[in-house]
Amino acid sequence: MEYPYTTKMLSSSLSPQNGTWSDTISLLLALGVALYLGYYWACVPQRPRLVAGPQFLAFLEQHCPVTVETFYPTLWCFEGRLQTIFRVLLQSQPVVPYRSEVLQTPDGGQFLLDWAEQPNSTHYPDPTTQPIVLLLPGISGSSQEPYILHLVNQALKDGYRAVVFNNRGCRGEELLTHRAYCASNTEDLETVVKHIKRRYSQAPLLAVGISFGGILVLNYLAQTGKAGGLVAGLTMSACWDSFETVDSLETPLNSLLFNQPLTAGLCRLVARNRKPIEKVLDVDFAIKARTIRQLDERYTSVAFGYKDCAAYYQAASPRTKVDAIHTPVLCLNAADDPFSPVHAFPLQAAQKSPYVALLITARGGHIGFLEGLMPWQHCYMNRVLHQYARAIFQHSVGLPDLGVLTPEDGKS
């Protein structure tokens, strides 16, 4: 039996002309936005966790308010992987007039330093004592990375001289030996620090390492003790445990988004420098690697003389070396970093150390830390550098006695 009148009424009530469907969709969208905003404001903005010994903790709380203030990640991309990806896609590339310098290494290699000068600094008019910020990029990065350019600009705005240490081959220069770089070998960083201190012996030097560069800074500080030539260190998104890092990067989504593209870029560096490398290993086999672990097994651990990849990862992991660090270093990490899992952070060691402080944000990803609705310019990393460098260069009177603290007094 047909009910033409009922059918007609139902069709009419659901027709687009009556606005029922559009009103429903609008209501659902409004509800979705409200739920999203409610979740964001209830769960996402949080104060970072600051883990340090009591004197260093008090120093940071007093001179670096960013360490105790709520971090508000960008509203529309606060998840860790999104923060990591959008930092690469969205950040602007400010123009920095670098002056490049080639350094030769004791083993016959070479790499580039890129200097950014502030010749008429009103804060530090004496160029012999003008503070220097030494920046170390990520594993395949250089002085041209947007995050490095922004940090260099921040250093210049604050009146400092900036210099970027480009790992061998990362600025396009050819390798002169079979060795590029690895996270456990700090010989090139030692060459850089000595070179800077010879030229500017009276200038305080702060090393800022990002990701792979942060691992180098931590390992360098652990190896040199108080004789490293640095007044302090700052790391951002450093990977504390190499085993945990490669495990995290080999999960399906992280492998697709990060591991495979990063490995491909490193393989291109090896292939581009085939001539010196093929003297010690099979280049064709090495560049078939599809993961960081495979490349480290086939190239890095072999080139740097390790028994195997596990031995290299053990030597490269700063997680076990916190007690050996005797220079103040602030370490910024995000709990949702796909490269550096939070369970690998050395919380207890930092709590007992007078020199190492961990600044852990709930969000931020890997070299992300985007904040504000339109995060094209500055981000949380810039603010951390600005306040920490100022604290180190202007208020260092609170730092020399850190070593007299008793380890039991640490807190978080």
From Swiss-Prot:
Record family assignment: Belongs to the AB hydrolase superfamily. AB hydrolase 4 family.
Gene this chain is encoded by: Abhd1
Active site, UniProt feature: 211, 337, 366
Keyword Transmembrane: yes
Source lineage: Eukaryota, Metazoa, Chordata, Craniata, Vertebrata
Broad class of the protein's primary localization: membrane
Cysteine pairs bridged by disulfides in the record: none
Pfam family, one: Abhydrolase_1
Annotated SUPFAM superfamilies: alpha/beta-Hydrolases
E.C. code: 3.1.1.-
Intracellular or extracellular location(s): Membrane
The protein's name in its UniProt record: Protein ABHD1
Listed transmembrane segments: 25-45
Gene3D superfamilies the UniProt entry points to: alpha/beta hydrolase
Tissues/organs with expression: Widely expressed with higher expression in liver.
Top-rank taxon: Eukaryota
Residues bearing attached sugar chains per UniProt: 18
Boundaries of every AB hydrolase-1 domain copy: 131-372
GO molecular function, one term: carboxylic ester hydrolase activity
GO CC annotations on file: membrane
Bilayer topology annotation: Single-pass type II membrane protein
Annotated keywords: Glycoprotein, Hydrolase, Membrane, Serine esterase, Signal-anchor, Transmembrane, Transmembrane helix
